Each structure stands twice: as C-alpha cells, then as structure tokens.
Amino acid sequence: METVQCDSALSYVVLSALFSGLVARKLIRNKVKIENVAVSCLLSLLLLEIFCCCVFCSHLGLLLFVAACALYYVSIPVRRMLTAQGKTVLITGCDSGLGHALAKYFDELGVLVYAGVLDKKGQGAEELRRVCSSRLSLIQLDVTNQGQIKTVYDEVKNRVQDAGLWGIVHNAGVLGYMADGELLPISIYKQCMDVNFIGVVQVTKMFMPLLRKAKGRLVTISSMAGHAPIPGFAAYAASKAALTMFSAVMRQDLFKWGVRVSAVHPSGFKTNIFGSRELWSSQYKNILDNIMPDVKEDYGEDYLATLKDLHYTMSTITSSDLSPVLEDVCHALLAREPYFSYTPGQCAYLIPCLFRYFPLWVYDNFAKQTFQTHRNILPRSLRNSKSNNKMD
C-alpha cells in the first residue's frame, strides 16, 4: 500500500514539473503577464493536486489532475499581433509625458499617428516634428473644445475615408491638486471631470462612426485611483472612476459592432501630470483664496503648507520607465485578442485588491502609511482638541 502511495505521489511530482515547464515556456513565448486570474488558477491547481493525491488512491485522481492542467494550458492566450502598417491611431495629450512617449512609440512601429497637442508650437510638439517620421501628424486638440474636436474629425475622415480609424488612445488628463476634498475648489473638480471624463466622451462620440467602420480599438488611460480611494485624490479619483465605468459600458455597447474597448490603469509612473513647483504654488494660492475663513482656521496654515510637500513626494517616488504602459497600450491596439483591463506599474492591482477584498481598516491603514507617511501633522483644530483632552 505504501509503495502504491509513493508511486502515486511521484507521478504527481513528475506531472507537476512537466506542466510547470510547459506553462512557463508558453507564458514567456507569448509574453503573457501573470495577473490575478492566472495566479488564482495556479493556486487552484495546486490545491486540486493535493486533494487528488490525498483523497484518490487510484488513477482517477491522476486523470482529473491531468485534465485540469490541460484545460489551464489551453486557456493561456497565444500572443497573436496584428500588423501596425496601414493603421491610423489618434492619441490625445501628446505634448509631454505618456502621450508624448506613445506618439513616438507607435510612429516607430509604423502606425499612422495623429498626435493631439494643446500647443502645436510648444516644446513637445517641436520634438515630435524633429524625431518622428512623416507618418505622424500633429493636430491642435483640446479635448474640452468641441470646435477643435470637429475640426480634427473632418481632417481624419478625409484622410482615412472608407478604411475608418483603427484606434483612439484617450491619454489627455489632469491631476488638479492633491488635498483634502473639503479644501479643493470646485474649479479643480470641474477641470478634472471636463478633461478626464467629459473630454473622453466628447471625442469618443465624435469619432465613433470612423471607429465602427474599421472595427477598431478604443483605449482609455484611466488610473488605479479610479478603483480605490486614495487620500488627497478626491477630484482626480472621481473623474477616473467615471472614466473606468464609461469604458466598461462602452465595451458592452460596442461589442456588437466589432469594436474592442480596453482600459489601462497605470500606477506609479513619472509623467508631467504631477506638474511643477510653479503650478503647485499657483494651485496652493488658489486654495487659500477660495476656502472659507472658518475652514482655514480649522485646518491651519501649517497643515495647508504640507500639501505642496505631498506633491513633491509623489513626484519623486514614481518610475520614469514608461515601457510597461507602452507595451500594454500596444497590446490593446494590436493584439488579436486584447484584454479589457491592464494594470501596469507598482501596486496597480494590489491596491484595488486590498480595497475590495479586505476589511476597510486594513486598506485604510495601508493607504495612510503608503500615501501620507510624511504628513505627521493634524489640522489645527484637531491638535487643539487633543491637547485639551490630555489636559483633562
């Protein structure tokens, strides 16, 4: 009996080793990212192996385990990419940062790029003219300006004609300012919604006839902040949450037309969305000019002054390597079977997972330690209240 059990256990070990090698080879060859679904399946297979080995003493358990492994292996996506040549893609927000990098990246791949910029005479636009090929066309595009959107639509329509537009990458976005939600002026909330959400809707609605004609791709650059609350991101996160849900609904609506929709949720990348010290100072002054006197008194100017430190810290802990985002956007545009959701970057999946599946106190403590470690100061009224309690 012991010999049979040893032979059975050895069979499971051999099969597991063989299966692991085959899976690793297929994952590497097809550049498949190990994300939550893949990890869950692998853990399930491990538990199934233990169960089959312990409960079934016959070949039935072995056959069940082999069948499960085979199903998992077949389910691993094969990286089949479409050719980039001849495809036309519109990218918004190409003046700097991620949009600028995307314009260069897809131009090098041979895509006909329409790079939308706020300033055609700006430094970013000039660099794109200098380093990119004649395939790239610079266009003046403010996503909040309906007139500019219509002008760009007419230009693109005349060029692509019956072929249609293969892809739109909604990259244009603003952060506004990081501060307690009560402190943010309504103007910042409106700016975030206008650019990050309403602008995307306006451009999408205008270009959908061309996108449907090509049975192309709609790609939105959202954010991990659209899935989980982060202290100080009230305006930005609300706009990205709206964008995330818009993308999810459009995926359902456009499926019947053959248009595939993908949402990319980057986390921890260094782009110009954080702004500069001059912008932080301007926004800080805007906050001071707009908050009510009693609110300013409750928070205290020493607390308000730490807000600029928050921007500086966030801009220094991010990664300047944008390649994970570029590769994911490329997959969304050119893969035969694109994913709906991509999560490149540090903690892009971990943070939403903690928020959804763990007790709120676990996530709240994690968020506090991760995003506010340098802010060891309370608002003035809370400090005074604590001092009074200690005296009592």
Listing of model-derived features with the role each one plays in the protein:
Residues 223:
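Residue(s) in the substrate-gating loop at a strand-loop-helix junction
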Residues 256-339:
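SDR active-site lid
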Residues 158, 164, 175-190, 232:
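Conserved mid-core segment of classical short-chain dehydrogenase/reductases
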Residues 72-114:
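Canonical Rossmann dinucleotide-binding motif of NAD(H)/NADP(H)-dependent dehydrogenases/reductases
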Residues 204, 239-242:
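Active-site helix of classical SDR
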Residues 109-125:
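Conserved glycine-rich Rossmann-like NAD(P)H-binding loop of the short-chain dehydrogenase/reductase
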Residues 141-154, 186:
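The beta1-alpha1 cofactor-binding region of Rossmann-like NAD(H)/NADP(H)-dependent oxidoreductases
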